[in-house]
């Protein structure tokens, strides 16, 4: 059997960079890691709870965290302009206060910035959320996967692979279905591949969605 490795971890330092940039003493490293998890969780919860921000799905491509002694810099990469645009500064201030409250950190200031991505459907997280929304609305999984592939073609990607696992279409036995378009060279380290895993709760149970996108070769 082939051993599967996470394509992002496999390429760290080569074509993939870290989403968290900070240093810590070995004793306090785990606390820093938990702090990062709290920040990401808080941002996602805030977007989900505000219907004016999320039209069915979050639209967040990734969240980068950079820490200094006195500052935590958070950059949220979004795919769609409706997220945080209406009453922009007000929305960011609310979010900043919400995250600061959750962290309960006195020594470090928190700064949240928003960055827009030009081709949102080239991002696996946004694409996975789109497929999840289709599956929740009981659209056929094959139709949802084909539509997702059509959307990635607009983003000039070189290849995409989509995998859905679980009780697909409410069948009694769980199975795995996948589709690939173009090249997805998982064993080539210099190939820049974006990957994500997303869970979706349907009326039949939980489905797992995995997406691999071949962006470019360095």
From Swiss-Prot:
One Pfam family it belongs to: Ribosomal_S3_C
Compartments (UniProt record): Plastid, Chloroplast
GO MF term list: rRNA binding; structural constituent of ribosome
Keyword Ribosomal protein: yes
Region forming the signal peptide: none
Keywords assigned: Chloroplast, Plastid, Ribonucleoprotein, Ribosomal protein, RNA-binding, rRNA-binding
Taxonomy, superkingdom: Eukaryota
Similarity field: Belongs to the universal ribosomal protein uS3 family.
This protein's name: Small ribosomal subunit protein uS3c
Organism of this sequence: Acorus calamus
């Amino acid at each position: 059997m082939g051993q599967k490795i996470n394509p992002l971890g496999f390429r760290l330092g080569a074509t993939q960079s870290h989403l968290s940039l900070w240093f810590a003493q070995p004793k306090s490293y785990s606390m820093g890691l938990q702090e990062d998890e709290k920040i990401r969780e808080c941002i996602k919860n805030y977007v989900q709870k505000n219907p004016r921000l999320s039209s069915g799905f979050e639209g967040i491509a990734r969240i980068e965290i950079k820490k200094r002694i006195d500052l935590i810099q958070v950059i949220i990469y979004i795919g769609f302009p409706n997220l945080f645009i209406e009453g922009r500064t007000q929305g960011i201030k609310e979010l900043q206060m919400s995250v600061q409250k959750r962290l309960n950190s006195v020594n470090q200031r928190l700064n949240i910035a928003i960055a827009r991505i030009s081709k949102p459907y080239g991002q696996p997280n946004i694409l996975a959320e789109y497929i999840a929304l289709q599956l929740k609305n009981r659209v056929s999984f094959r139709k949802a996967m084909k539509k997702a592939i059509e959307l990635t073609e607009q983003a000039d990607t070189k290849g995409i692979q989509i995998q859905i696992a679980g009780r697909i279409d409410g069948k009694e036995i769980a199975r795995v279905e996948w589709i690939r378009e173009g090249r997805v060279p998982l064993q080539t380290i210099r190939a820049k591949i974006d990957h994500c895993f997303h869970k979706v709760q349907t009326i039949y149970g939980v489905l797992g969605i995995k997406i691999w996108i071949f962006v470019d070769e360095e």
